[in-house]
Each structure stands twice: as C-alpha cells, then as structure tokens.
Amino acid sequence: KRRSQHVQGIKALKATGGNVAFEFPAQRISVEAERPDGAIDVANVGVVAVVPYIIMKTAAMGRGKAKDAYDIYFIIKHYIGGVRELAKEFEPVKDKNIVIEAKDKLASKFASENHAGPKDVADFMDLEDEESIEMIKRDTYEQVQALMNLI
C-alpha cells in the first residue's frame, strides 16, 4: 500500500531519496513544444533538482522498468556542461548514506556493458540491429562509470 503525506500543501507519495529533493532548490525550466492543435506554446515548470532525481531513479531500478535505467543514462549523457558538471552537483551530499547507497546500486547495475543497466537502456530504446545495441550498451556503461569515478 502506498502512503502519501501533505508536504508544503501538496499531497506527495513517499519515495526513496525523496527527502533529498528538499535539500536542493527546485529548478525552473522553459519548455517549448507544439500543441495537438498545431500551435507552439511555452510553459515554465518547476522540476526536481538533478541529484535527487538520479537518487530516486536509482532507488527505483529494482522495480523492473527499463525506463529507470534509460532516464539515468539520458541525464548523464545530456547534462549541460557534461559529466564533470553533473558530478559537481553531488559535492554537497556525496558523503550522505543515501548517495553512497545509490552509488553502490549504480555500480552493481552498471558494472559492465552486459549488466542489467546497459541492457535495460538498449531494451528501452528498442534498437533493431546488434551493432547499435552493443554501441548503446557500451556508451551507457562508460557514461555511468565516468560519473561514478567523479563523485
């Protein structure tokens, strides 16, 4: 049974790593996209900071959804400023138990290109040819290892 609680006036589900989200300011981003009626629209939305997001996605990896591994890979691969800038975001909390636990889980799930993490990423991307699958698995492994080595 999922339990929720009221936090700052919002009913929120409890999630492993969710408490870390309150140690980082929410980020505001601008999203521009085409609506179903064809008009281009812009919205400014608040999103959780990257460190708690990665911690929560890592905690969720045991639920058997390939998207969790893909989301981690995507954030690392596309973080503005690269993996070094992303690693700097972890600096204030790198010694917290929850971060150490997340690193341990990432290390086990992404221990090689043949482990569950890279395989889940390739599966989620629904790639057809073996060469593309192997390239993505290798890139996933290398991206996660690069972050792990810098935290």
Predicted regions and their residues:
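Compositionally biased terminal segments of proteins
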Residues: K1-I151
